[in-house]
Amino acid sequence: MNMPPDFKHLDSPDEWTQAFPVMQELRPHLQDAASFARQMRRQRDEHYRLLAARDASGAVLGLAGYRLQMNTLYGRFLYVDDLIVTARQQRSGIGAGLLDQVRDIAHRSDCAHLVLDTGLHMPFAQRFYFRNGLLAKGMHFVESLQTIRKEAAQ
């Protein structure tokens, strides 16, 4: 019988480095563990937290990166930047466990909403979110400012 995962916030460069291979499954553009640790430090300075689901040996099985925010649309809310479970652990309940953990953090932090974005190319993630009580409320639009800067410079 499998033991339930241990949920722990990762706060040090060593812990972030250990979590890098899991995050890279979600964010393949991330190049290396050292750069990832530096990125985590910068994001932590902007109130980002990284929560890990770990097995009894301490191996990272999944991650939820989030931050508490406030805006005129949602009031105080918890925004999930990153939610990933290793390919081998998907459909094991770890993703739902991570979502429950951040939902509890949102409740304790007096948030009115839990918010996240997912790509239109990720139908399995969308189905997971629907099954776990999240509803699609809008679309996310992006414009690369790097492209605009390059075109303006030419």
Where in this protein do the model-derived segments appear?
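Acetyl-CoA-dependent GNAT
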Residues: 2-75, 99-101, 144-146
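Conserved GNAT acetyl-CoA-binding A-motif
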Residues: 106-118
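Terminal substrate-recognition subdomain of acyl/acetyltransferases
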Residues: 2-3, 104-107, 134-135, 139-154
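Short acidic/polar active-site loop segments enriched in Thr and Asp
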Residues: 49, 112, 135
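Residue-level recognition of the GNAT/N-acetyltransferase active site
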Residues: 86, 119
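Conserved acetyl-CoA-binding loop-helix of GNAT-fold acetyltransferases
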Residues: 85, 91-104, 131
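A conserved beta-turn-beta hairpin within the catalytic core of GNAT-like acetyltransferases
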Residues: 69-80, 90, 136-137
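Conserved active-site alpha-helix within GNAT-family acetyltransferase domains
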Residues: 96, 108, 120-139, 143
